């Protein structure tokens, strides 16, 4: 494939990835604010579905296309902006894999119970607070990547 084809795939991956993590965070916060167990439970299930369908797909497109284009700039270590961008992408992935996904799994298990009726347990809200804080960081890192990939400082 040509460089431009990989670039289009890379941009598509960024749009899918960043679009999903941003929109998911917004509607999860809005659903949680209702404190309605049925709404919160439904939103929590959708977080899992959309992460599998869109976040993972976008991340895969970014990773593969980024690797394929990196050679044009001397590889991942060939340019400072590329090295930093790769590090930010990995850091965001580490946050997702080590904390956000496990939190989502725990919240989904809790949501299965209260989504059919019943009170939302305090543990769900403690996990939600942690998810919001770490999620903000996991969103900020790819946003910084956009600057690096466009400006190439």
Locations of regions flagged by a protein language model:
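Polytopic transmembrane helical bundles with strong interfacial aromatic enrichment
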Residues: 1-153
